Amino acid sequence: MFVDIAKIYVKAGDGGDGIVAFRREKYVPAGGPAGGDGGKGGDVIFVADRELNTLLDFKYKRHYKAQNGERGGPNNMHGKDGEDLIIKVPVGTVIKDAETGEIIADLSREGDRAIVAHGGRGGRGNAHFATATRQVPRFAEVGEKGDELWVILELKVLADVGLIGYPNVGKSTFLSVATNARPEIANYPFTTKYPNLGIVYISEGESFVLADIPGLIEGASEGAGLGHQFLRHVERTKVLIHIVDVSGSEGREPVEDFIKINEELKKYSPELAQKPQIVAANKMDLPDAQAYFELFKEEIEKMGYEVYPISAATGMGIREVLKRAYELLKQQKAAENIEEDAKPRTFVYYKKKDVKPLTVRKENGVYVVEGTVVEKVARNIVLNDHDSFRYFQNFLNKLGVFDKLREMGIQDGDIVRILDVEFEYYE
């Protein structure tokens, strides 16, 4: 089964907690704090692998989580970092943030990497909180949470040349004759529901990848038929072979079909419509095809396109079309200065997080303090003794929280809440 789109959840590892510990050595009577820091959580990293050609695995498994960092140890021992989670995807995979639609990375080269979720920082051990006036801190930080998000994976087939045209015009037959591919072929529309790939050999050392893309219909740019699936794959190709049935056997109007498909390409992407395009007038082996062809050729050449008469059923004219496609492909690669041995790239994504300003409001008699900075500290410090609470109070004072509370008329004994932390206020 060919699967070319998937939605999955990824979660980076949480940071390990810092710990509270003190040196316990025989000849060191006042060893001081020695709690180690927690390890960093593992990242979630996507890697492009040319051995894969479908997103099928993600149909059955949709949740992925990297390893958490380990707790710190005594004697200032740093906790072990969590292992990164490597997720392999086919070359040609585009990764998007499912919430915003933002493109995170386009993994179009073998070995391309995308770090999409970052592991949480490890919490600091109590050794970090020792000061001249707080020589025996009995508190530490917990590790930060790792990033989490839903992402959409879209596979865009990496073919050099794409076969386009209305359903049932002979694209699959053309592919089977031109390559060793064995696509499903039948006399009804949308036989091809997924891209079929084959290798075209022009001569020794000269070849290209040819894709039979699912049939396109009017309205495809708005998603009709297999529209968006079709157009997503066409984006990757550098040259298009537009196959048109000129026999009239299906009761269609060849020139009208040609114009409509190019209109759909342009609606979806103006760049797509500018790709070099060879027109292959198919089914020339059928009766009356020659008469239709002469009229068709005259109209299409007026638009500036090259037209080749072919018969996918007999093989007539196909070699000439393939040679011309290869010539155009070489020109495109030279113009784009594409390096076949281009080095892999690394994409790094940081999901934008809302930064909340410091605010204080009164709700049901409780003073509620909110803000990104103050909430981060409240989340990371375990407030379980006098030392930790004193540290937290000093932080709030420096941040200006107490000044805001006084401005609002707070009285001794009133309750203050930050996240799930509540305490009584006293001057």
Curated annotation (Swiss-Prot):
<dbReference type="InterPro" id="IPR045086">
    <property type="entry name" value="OBG_GTPase"/>
</dbReference>
<keyword id="KW-0963">Cytoplasm</keyword>
<keyword id="KW-0460">Magnesium</keyword>
<dbReference type="GO" id="GO:0000287">
    <property type="term" value="F:magnesium ion binding"/>
</dbReference>
<dbReference type="InterPro" id="IPR015349">
    <property type="entry name" value="OCT_dom"/>
</dbReference>
<feature type="domain" description="OCT">
    <location>
        <begin position="347"/>
        <end position="427"/>
    </location>
</feature>
<dbReference type="InterPro" id="IPR036346">
    <property type="entry name" value="GTP-bd_prot_GTP1/OBG_C_sf"/>
</dbReference>
<feature type="binding site">
    <location>
        <position position="172"/>
    </location>
    <ligand>
        <name>Mg(2+)</name>
    </ligand>
</feature>
<dbReference type="Pfam" id="PF01018">
    <property type="entry name" value="GTP1_OBG"/>
</dbReference>
<dbReference type="InterPro" id="IPR031167">
    <property type="entry name" value="G_OBG"/>
</dbReference>
<dbReference type="InterPro" id="IPR027417">
    <property type="entry name" value="P-loop_NTPase"/>
</dbReference>
<comment type="function">
    <text>An essential GTPase which binds GTP, GDP and possibly (p)ppGpp with moderate affinity, with high nucleotide exchange rates and a fairly low GTP hydrolysis rate. Plays a role in control of the cell cycle, stress response, ribosome biogenesis and in those bacteria that undergo differentiation, in morphogenesis control.</text>
</comment>
<dbReference type="GO" id="GO:0005525">
    <property type="term" value="F:GTP binding"/>
</dbReference>
<keyword id="KW-0547">Nucleotide-binding</keyword>
<dbReference type="GO" id="GO:0003924">
    <property type="term" value="F:GTPase activity"/>
</dbReference>
<comment type="similarity">
    <text>Belongs to the TRAFAC class OBG-HflX-like GTPase superfamily. OBG GTPase family.</text>
</comment>
<dbReference type="InterPro" id="IPR036726">
    <property type="entry name" value="GTP1_OBG_dom_sf"/>
</dbReference>
<dbReference type="InterPro" id="IPR006169">
    <property type="entry name" value="GTP1_OBG_dom"/>
</dbReference>
<feature type="binding site">
    <location>
        <begin position="212"/>
        <end position="215"/>
    </location>
    <ligand>
        <name>GTP</name>
    </ligand>
</feature>
<dbReference type="InterPro" id="IPR006073">
    <property type="entry name" value="GTP-bd"/>
</dbReference>
<feature type="binding site">
    <location>
        <position position="192"/>
    </location>
    <ligand>
        <name>Mg(2+)</name>
    </ligand>
</feature>
<feature type="domain" description="Obg">
    <location>
        <begin position="1"/>
        <end position="158"/>
    </location>
</feature>
<dbReference type="GO" id="GO:0042254">
    <property type="term" value="P:ribosome biogenesis"/>
</dbReference>
<feature type="binding site">
    <location>
        <begin position="165"/>
        <end position="172"/>
    </location>
    <ligand>
        <name>GTP</name>
    </ligand>
</feature>
<feature type="binding site">
    <location>
        <begin position="282"/>
        <end position="285"/>
    </location>
    <ligand>
        <name>GTP</name>
    </ligand>
</feature>
<keyword id="KW-0342">GTP-binding</keyword>
<feature type="domain" description="OBG-type G">
    <location>
        <begin position="159"/>
        <end position="330"/>
    </location>
</feature>
<keyword id="KW-0479">Metal-binding</keyword>
<feature type="binding site">
    <location>
        <begin position="311"/>
        <end position="313"/>
    </location>
    <ligand>
        <name>GTP</name>
    </ligand>
</feature>
<dbReference type="InterPro" id="IPR014100">
    <property type="entry name" value="GTP-bd_Obg/CgtA"/>
</dbReference>
<feature type="binding site">
    <location>
        <begin position="190"/>
        <end position="194"/>
    </location>
    <ligand>
        <name>GTP</name>
    </ligand>
</feature>
<dbReference type="Pfam" id="PF01926">
    <property type="entry name" value="MMR_HSR1"/>
</dbReference>
<dbReference type="GO" id="GO:0005737">
    <property type="term" value="C:cytoplasm"/>
</dbReference>
<comment type="subunit">
    <text>Monomer.</text>
</comment>
<dbReference type="Pfam" id="PF09269">
    <property type="entry name" value="DUF1967"/>
</dbReference>
<dbReference type="InterPro" id="IPR006074">
    <property type="entry name" value="GTP1-OBG_CS"/>
</dbReference>
<protein>
    <recommendedName>
        <fullName>GTPase Obg</fullName>
        <ecNumber>3.6.5.-</ecNumber>
    </recommendedName>
</protein>
<keyword id="KW-0378">Hydrolase</keyword>
